[in-house]
Amino acid sequence: MRVLVSACLLGRNCKYSGGNNRNEKVLAFLQGKEVVPVCPEVEAGLPVPRPPVEIRKGRVVRKDGRDMDDIYRLGAARVLSRMGKVDLAILKSGSPTCGVHDIYDGTFSGKKIKGRGVLAEALVRAGVPVVDEKELLSGRDAEGVTAFRDKP
């Protein structure tokens, strides 16, 4: 089984802040599976660290208002072009690229709204089952993830 995973969840320091979101339970789930680590921001050539972005009115923007949409969508497109066939994607919740169910609202106030990040949306459109780390670990089956729990 091939699983595409947000690289920050694996402990790679690729977050906008320069840190990571290493998640031991995600790592345990991935044991025995082929892992395809991705960071769309890094794929797009953005530095680590980098200014934070949010999605405002469907566009990826920095706090200073600079539109970053094209570069973030380029990163998502590069992930799709190189990923090959994957059976499942586990992405970082809340991220403007990887958020599956919620994203920050574009005001940089910490408020979340329902929505998907640009990579999550592209994967869903490509027919890839997508979950975030919270959904994977909660036992909920909103995207049929339990069917993947025991697959090698």
Region spans (language model):
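Short N-terminal binding/cap micro-motifs at the start of the first secondary-structure element
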Residues: 11-18
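Short, active-site-adjacent cap segments at secondary-structure transitions
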Residues: 45-46, 96-99, 137-138
